[in-house]
A protein has these predicted regions:
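Positively charged, Gly/Ser-enriched RNA/tRNA-binding surfaces
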Residues: 2-3, 16, 37-50, 56-108, ...
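Glycine-rich loop at the start of a catalytic domain that most often binds anionic cofactors/ligands
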Residues: 4-21
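Short acidic, glycine-rich loop/turn motifs
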Residues: 21-25, 231-233
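Hydrophobic alpha-helical transmembrane segments in multi-pass integral membrane proteins
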Residues: 29-36
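A conserved hydrophobic position in a structured secondary element of the catalytic/binding core
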Residues: 32, 116, 262
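Short, conserved phosphate-binding/catalytic loop or strand-edge motifs used
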Residues: 75-79, 115-123
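Short terminal or interdomain "cap/linker" segment that borders an active site or interface and mediates
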Residues: 118-153
């Protein structure tokens, strides 16, 4: 799409990740989407135009000019959800619990969720949040580099410098919120954000919860809760989400919004669902009209039926399915035989 609609209101992170080229027909710059959220925001603003809450989902491929990390694919296949029109913690809870349930369905037995809140950084930075000087602060927070953070925060108020260093070194389980509530500036926005994190950590349904306010990706458009899920032996998050109120403002309709994206290629590469093969019925025998009709009848009833081809073995089927029944011919027709 033309970049003026593809990137509007999304911040420099997405701009830097977007492949761009010149349209020879118009001379305008075209980009290939690196994220699907801006497109969803435009759909909510212009195509749907609902006054109430909109719940949307999507799946598709994106293209990154720069990979998210050295081992990442530059063509991630993603799926996700967006909830527009609700600003309360209840909407955040709906999205986070859905994220946890999604990963459980995909076969991840122990879900570890990492929670942050962008309102804290926004409250500390104030109007500086859109300045170039903040890039160094954000980079240092991401790297958890106290020396680089001190250099980047030169000129900031001493209270802000101390608060940033506190965020950098204070992360872990939910108990660290006690320290942050006590030692961070007593601004109402900061204390409210810490309370939200505590409540969401309690109700999101994850097996393990940690708190880290240095995960500040997308700080230019994220406005509230942020969360990510990591799994063992994988370097990057397989799911990211958060709140980004006002993402549709550039399309003429500012709406509160939250959602998440799950990176399917990462999960497929780890074969996390391999131990959860679906159950199936196996049907064998030469071509016959009555046999094919019975196979179709079982499929219409909701059964997965694998019609064995010549030379195909049961062992081949077991790589994808758990065979629980076999369709066998009897003197009275067909019946399902348990295996």
């Amino acid at each position: 799409e033309y970049v003026d609609s593809l990137l509007t209101g999304s911040g420099s992170d997405l701009d830097n990740s977007t492949f761009k080229f010149m349209d020879p027909g118009t001379g305008r710059t075209i980009g290939i989407r690196a994220d699907m959220t801006p497109q969803c925001a435009r759909i909510d603003a212009h195509i749907l135009g609902r006054k109430g809450v909109s719940r949307l989902c999507y799946a598709g491929s994106c293209l990154h000019a720069r990979p998210m990390h050295p081992l990442a694919s530059r063509e991630p296949v993603v799926a996700g959800v967006e909830l527009f029109g609700a600003s309360g913690i209840e909407a955040d809870a709906e999205i986070m619990t859905l994220a946890v349930r999604t990963l459980k369905k995909l076969g991840i037995d122990v879900v570890h969720i990492d929670i942050g809140h962008m309102a804290i950084l926004h409250a500390l930075m104030g109007e500086r949040i859109s300045d170039e000087s903040v890039h160094g602060v954000v980079r240092a927070l991401r790297m958890k580099d106290p020396v680089a953070l001190a250099e980047a925060a030169v000129g900031f108020d001493p209270e802000v410098q101390q608060a940033l260093q506190l965020l950098l070194r204070t992360f872990g389980d939910v108990s660290v919120l006690d320290i942050l509530e006590r030692e961070l500036p007593q601004k109402s926005e900061i204390q409210a954000a810490l309370r939200e994190v505590r409540e969401l950590a309690n109700i999101c349904g994850a097996d393990e919860v940690s708190v880290d306010f240095c995960d500040v990706h997308g700080y230019q458009y994220l406005t509230g809760i942020t969360f990510s899920v990591n799994i063992p032996n994988y370097a990057q998050a397989v799911l990211r989400g958060g709140r980004y109120d006002g993402v549709g403002l550039a399309f003429g309709r500012s709406r509160p919004a939250c959602g998440f994206t799950v990176y399917l290629r990462a999960l497929a590469g780890l074969q996390v669902a391999a131990s959860h093969h679906p159950q199936a019925v196996v049907a064998r025998g030469p071509l016959a009209r009555d046999l094919e009709a019975q196979v179709e009848k079982l499929r219409d009833e909701g059964h997965i039926v694998v019609r064995l081809l010549p030379g195909e073995r049961d062992e081949d089927v077991l790589e994808q399915f758990v065979i629980t029944k076999e369709l066998v011919r009897t003197s009275l027709g067909f019946e399902l035989k348990a295996l």
